[in-house]
Design a protein with these regions (language model features):
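Conserved beta-strand positions in repeat-built beta-propeller and related beta-rich domains
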Residues: 72-78, 111, 116-123, 157-161, ...
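Surface loop/turn motifs at the tips and blade-to-blade linkers of beta-strand repeat domains
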Residues: 52-57, 98-102, 137-142, 179-185, ...
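Beta-strand-rich domains and repeat architectures in extracellular enzymes and scaffolds
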Residues: 50-83, 98-99, 103-110
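Short loop/turn segments that connect beta-strands within beta-propeller blades
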Residues: 88-92, 130-134, 169-172, 214-218, ...
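Signature of short aromatic-glycine-proline-rich micro-motifs recurring in repeat-based ectodomains
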Residues: 61, 190, 236-245
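Bacterial signal peptide processing site
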Residues: 32-34
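C-terminal motif of bacterial Sec signal peptides marking the signal peptidase cleavage site
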Residues: 28-30
Length: 269
């Protein structure tokens, strides 16, 4: 009887010690699993090139967007060269064109209802046009203007920092700002923007990746590689990827860059 009792005590003691070891091990395993599947880790996607099309010659692309008829609106930069252009992606033919004053360096563009907004780089001036490229309004903002897109009842603007600025689409008054982060770190040099289904797709100056951003939080949810586009002929340091236009009714985009001679029709995969 004594031997059986001692055996029982020894077994219970062993089981208690095993439990004390197992619990923290399980906890550590759970923590490790949570870290490896962090909800803040972005998707890593790429583009598939479907087609190419001509771009108006010598265009220092600052903004690109599809109009209601499938033509493309193009905003270009450089002092004395800045323009607002409507052209056919099928032929490259310029259908409509407006030259900015030589004192203005054109930047990002977007459509809002029947209007077109165009930013300027250092003058802090936003220009609004009607569908015939007649200027109907001019508004001012602080800092530089880089990229612009229309998201539901607001315009979203970049200024070369890690900040998205939420602007009133009628007055261009600033409503709020959001800092863009990739896994907790700020994403600087945000450039051309395209708003699609509540997300913002952004070029980053000097980068060959496109970032998909939640505009309300600033979180980058996808990093999209454009390595499938052959950029070997674009050798000037200024010839960077810059220009994103969603093709309505599809999951496709037109992409281009500064001084590029072609558009690339792509699908994100």
């Amino acid at each position: 009887m004594m031997a059986r009792r001692q055996w029982y005590i020894w077994c219970m003691s062993f089981l208690r010690r095993a439990a004390l070891i197992a619990v923290p091990c399980c906890a550590l395993t759970a923590c490790s699993s949570d870290n490896s599947d962090s909800p803040n880790s972005p998707e890593h996607l790429s583009v598939e090139v479907l087609d190419t099309a001509p771009l108006p010659e010598n265009s220092f692309t600052q903004g690109l967007e599809e109009d209601s008829e499938g033509n493309l609106l193009l905003g270009t930069g450089q002092w004395g060269e800045s323009r607002l252009i409507r052209f056919s992606p099928e032929t490259g033919e310029i259908l409509q064109e407006h030259a900015l004053d030589d004192s203005l360096f054109g930047e990002g563009i977007t459509r809002y209802n029947d209007s077109i907004w165009q930013l300027t780089w250092k003058r802090g001036q936003a220009l609004r046009y009607d569908s015939n490229f007649q200027r109907t309004k001019s508004a001012t903002y602080a800092g530089e203007g880089w990229g612009l897109c229309a998201n539901q009842d607001e315009l979203i603007m970049s200024d070369g920092t890690s900040t998205l600025r939420h602007m009133d689409p009628e007055t261009f008054a600033e409503r709020s700002t959001t800092e863009v982060t990739l896994e907790g770190s700020p994403v600087e040099d945000l450039n051309e923007l395209e708003c699609v289904d509540g997300d913002v797709y952004a070029n980053v100056w000097g980068s060959e990746d496109i970032y998909r951003i939640v505009p309300s939080s600033g979180e980058v949810t996808a990093v999209i590689s454009t390595d499938a586009i052959d950029k070997s002929k674009y050798t000037d340091p200024d010839d960077v990827l810059n220009g994103i236009a969603h093709i309505k009714g599809t999951d496709e985009f037109w992409l281009t860059g500064k001084r590029w001679d072609e558009l690339y029709r792509v699908r994100v995969k």
